[in-house]
Design a protein with these regions (language model features):
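Cytoplasmic juxtamembrane interface segments
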Residues: 54-74, 194, 206
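Alpha-helical transmembrane segments
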Residues: 15, 45, 81-85, 122, ...
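Short, Lys/Arg-rich, polar N-terminal cytosolic tail immediately upstream
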Residues: 1-6
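Alpha-helical transmembrane segments of multipass membrane proteins
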Residues: 16-25, 46-51, 87-96, 164-167, ...
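Alpha-helical transmembrane segments in multi-pass membrane proteins
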Residues: 7-64, 111, 116-117
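Juxtamembrane "helix-exit" motif on the non-cytosolic side of transmembrane helices
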Residues: 24-34, 98-106, 169-175
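Transmembrane helix-loop-helix hairpins at the membrane interface
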Residues: 120-238
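Juxtamembrane helix-loop-helix connectors linking adjacent transmembrane helices
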Residues: 33-37, 64-134, 228-238
Length: 238
């Protein structure tokens, strides 16, 4: 695949997630809402497929995956990692509060399905697999195939950021316009800042650490609701 064609991969995760949830619900003979709580398991599967696709695309261009995202050992200070991690947390939370207020008139709104309990052993495995696979898949795609490949500065930031946020509309997939808008607005401020930071620094490591941290927090909540009886109902009632 030619380097100038790599940006055409940007919509792939949104499409695959939509198809994955719809097809799995159809095969199981259940409603989309009923399969939503398995989103973390399905996300890991899509992440692995994404990583394999990125490795293949990189090799077609005579690169490694690490070269695709410009990952270099030893070039990052811990202060930068700490700063970006804090930035991810603050902007990520602010985006969710703003989206909750705009879409549900409730700044503290959070879709219950995101932390819904699943089988304990899957939840425990996912606390490792989800953060790691998501970081490599998403940052590899939107930074490596997006920001790194698009020549125009503003397009290099805004186009990958758009698709970076859009994919979350389908994780999990619910055919509800307000929910889709909420998910998009929740992540758009953060994805713009991450793409801007990467465009300026060309260093993915701080972004990847911060990204993994927020996904680890989500996975930890799923472990908690899956292992502590009554916790999910209590959290939904807050």
């Amino acid at each position: 695949m030619k380097r100038n064609l790599l940006p055409i991969l940007l919509p792939i995760r949104s499409i695959v997630f939509l198809l994955t949830f719809v097809v799995c619900a159809w095969l199981a003979g259940i409603d989309l809402c009923a399969i939503g709580h398995w989103w973390s398991m399905l996300a890991v599967a899509v992440n692995i497929l994404t990583i394999l696709l990125l490795v293949y695309a990189a090799r077609k261009n005579g690169q490694t995956f690490w070269q695709l995202i410009n990952y270099q050992k030893g070039q990052t200070r811990w202060t930068a990692i700490l700063w970006v991690t804090l930035l991810v947390l603050v902007v990520g939370m602010a985006g969710m509060y703003l989206a909750g207020f705009l879409c549900y008139s409730n700044m503290l709104y959070a879709p219950p399905v995101i932390i819904a309990p699943i089988a304990k052993w899957i939840a425990i495995i996912n606390i490792v697999l989800l953060p790691i696979s998501t970081t490599f898949a998403e940052d590899g795609l939107y930074l490596g195939c997006g920001v790194n490949q698009i020549k125009n500065k503003y397009a290099a930031i805004l186009v990958p950021a758009f698709f970076y946020a859009l994919q979350h509309c389908f994780i999990p997939t619910l055919l509800d316009g307000r929910y889709i808008l909420y998910r998009f607005l929740s992540f758009l401020p953060l994805t713009i800042i991450l793409c801007w930071y990467y465009y300026e620094k060309r260093n993915p490591r701080p972004i990847m650490v911060g990204h993994a941290f927020i996904d680890l927090a989500t996975a930890a909540q799923i472990v908690a609701t899956s292992t502590i009886p009554g916790l999910y109902e209590t959290m939904c009632g807050l």
